[in-house]
């Protein structure tokens, strides 16, 4: 049975914003390794559209960006959306019955399946489907934006904390 994991970069004041700050080299390598080992990813529409950047090679990319793109392209993706009519390669659209589709996905697969995007994660949290939360805490303060938890924070228990690179702490929580 697969485990659903929600992990995102977060500011010290609890916000996520991929445009305001991003991973440094060590954290990016960590994300490459994670992507290479994942059984797949579940995206909301907005995050999926952001990630489509990795569909096409870009001449300015270095070897690590090519490695991440390859890992992203190779893994199966499920895109939760009522407005999209089609999705790209290696992706399947989930339009109805979110709970049933994700329960089926977890039952059919093994390994880790990433959940991407705070709004989708909130819906899956409310359904009791997320098995682990990974907060990649960065030393920045945004003051506004989209919070990591898009709704009430669920009761959580700290499982682990570790440093990645010079300035990022990964906090790993499971539902309490």
Give the residues covered by each predicted segment.
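Enzymes that bind and transform nitrogen-containing heteroaromatic metabolites
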Residues: 1-176
């Amino acid at each position: 049975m697969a485990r659903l994991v929600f992990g995102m970069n977060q500011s010290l004041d609890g916000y996520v914003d991929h445009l305001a700050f991003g991973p440094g080299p060590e954290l990016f390598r960590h994300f490459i390794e994670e992507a290479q080992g994942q059984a797949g990813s579940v995206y909301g529409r907005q995050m999926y559209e952001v990630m489509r950047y990795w569909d096409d090679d870009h001449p300015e990319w270095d070897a690590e960006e090519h490695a991440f793109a390859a890992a992203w392209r190779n893994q199966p993706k499920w895109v939760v959306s009522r407005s999209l009519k089609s999705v790209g390669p290696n992706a399947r659209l989930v339009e109805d019955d979110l709970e049933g589709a994700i329960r089926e996905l977890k039952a059919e697969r093994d390994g880790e399946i990433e959940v991407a995007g705070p709004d989708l994660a909130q819906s899956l949290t409310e359904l009791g489907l997320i098995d682990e939360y990974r907060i990649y805490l960065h030393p920045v303060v945004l003051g506004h934006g989209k919070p990591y938890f898009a709704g009430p924070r669920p009761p959580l228990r700290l499982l682990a904390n570790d440093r990645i690179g010079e300035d990022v702490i990964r906090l790993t929580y499971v539902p309490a």
